[in-house]
Amino acid sequence: MASTICFILWVVFVTDTVWTRSVRQVYEASDPEDWTMHDFDCPRECFCPPSFPTALYCENRGLKEIPAIPSRIWYLYLENNLIETIPEKPFENATQLRWINLNKNKITNYGIEKGALSQLKKLLFLFLEDNELEEVPSPLPRSLEQLQLARNKVSRIPQGTFSNLENLTLLDLQHNKLLDNAFQRDTFKGLKNLMQLNMAKNALRNMPPRLPANTMQVFLDNNSIEGIPENYFNVIPKVAFLRLNHNKLSDAGLPSSGFNVSSILDLQLSHNQLTKVPKISAHLQHLHLDHNKIRNVNVSVICPSTPTTLPVEDSFSYGPHLRYLRLDGNEIKPPIPMDLMTCFRLLQAVII
């Protein structure tokens, strides 16, 4: 399952990168005489690639306003300008928009006209990173699949903001100003298909409440989280990647079962205050525990049990799946305990 997720995300990233590079190559190599085919509706501040009639490039132009968007446009690039507002009018004909990049502007919540974004019924990707937002914008179109809000000043999530975003799969709120009081028990209600949640680099002291059941990737690095409630992972039974690096987790703050959650494949707990290795699942493949206060590794506690009736050859398939273990930056002294290697027979790398 994890490899499938990574492959999908990698394909999306590579596809976007290659597509963008191809447009720029076309721009550099194309004959200016060919540009006239779309000049009739192309905003004079922007570039309309002749080989990609559904793309509109208006980035790095010093724009203070969004130009009128032609109806044929699917992909809109407006990053790195001086735009402060998102009014309805420029988008009144842009009924086909799938992708909007407004990163690195000066947009505030007060500058977003109420229906400007929600009227875009086919919008899938919305990038508003590096702006001046203080709360998650609302309302948003139901069609939205990815919402990128990193590096703003977001400290509030108005009630009901996500209630109709059932198609959203990725929510990026990293590097904002979120506190625990930004969340209600029903904050994430409606995000039925959310797969990745990134709230790294905020000011959280507690785990966010009641995450959507389908969430598979949770990134909470660089907060001030001190503990994890008992049975917290019961509501997110599909979580596979969990990052809690650079927090304030201690042994007393962990659930009694530790991280013995069968769905978790990659667990990152670097730079915390742990003094012992927590319990883990036999399905875990990558464990990062570097830069804690761990003095020794009690293998009898952390080694997931394997049925003794299994033949030796089957123990590799049904036994612990741990392949990568980081313990450097602790108070552990080599050599590596032999019973650690005996328990985790699939280990490919151990860093102490």
UniProtKB/Swiss-Prot annotation:
Domain LRRNT: 33-71
Modification after translation, per record: Binds three long, highly sulfated keratan sulfate chains in the cornea but short, non-sulfated poly(N-acetyllactosamine) chains in other tissues.
Cysteine-cysteine disulfides: C42-C48, C46-C58, C303-C343
Keyword Secreted: yes
Alphabetized Gene3D superfamilies for the sequence: Ribonuclease Inhibitor
Coiled coil stretches, renumbered: none
Tissue: Abundant in cornea and sclera but also found in other tissues.
Cited PROSITE patterns: LRR
InterPro entries attached to this UniProt entry: Leu-rich_rpt (IPR001611), Leu-rich_rpt_typical-subtyp (IPR003591), LRR_dom_sf (IPR032675), LRRNT (IPR000372), SLRP (IPR050333)
Signal peptide limits: 1-20
Keywords: Disulfide bond, Extracellular matrix, Glycoprotein, Leucine-rich repeat, Proteoglycan, Repeat, Secreted, Signal
Family annotation (Pfam families): LRR_6 (PF13516), LRR_8 (PF13855), LRRNT (PF01462)
LRR repeat copies, ranges: 72-93, 96-117, 122-142, 143-164, 167-180, 193-214, 215-235, 238-258, 263-282, 283-304
Primary location class: secreted
Residues carrying a glycan: N93, N167, N222, N260, N298
Role description: May be important in developing and maintaining corneal transparency and for the structure of the stromal matrix.
Family statement drawn from the similarity comment of this UniProt entry: Belongs to the small leucine-rich proteoglycan (SLRP) family. SLRP class II subfamily.
Listed name of the protein: Keratocan
Species the sequence originates in: Bos taurus (Bovine)
Lineage of origin: Eukaryota, Metazoa, Chordata, Craniata, Vertebrata
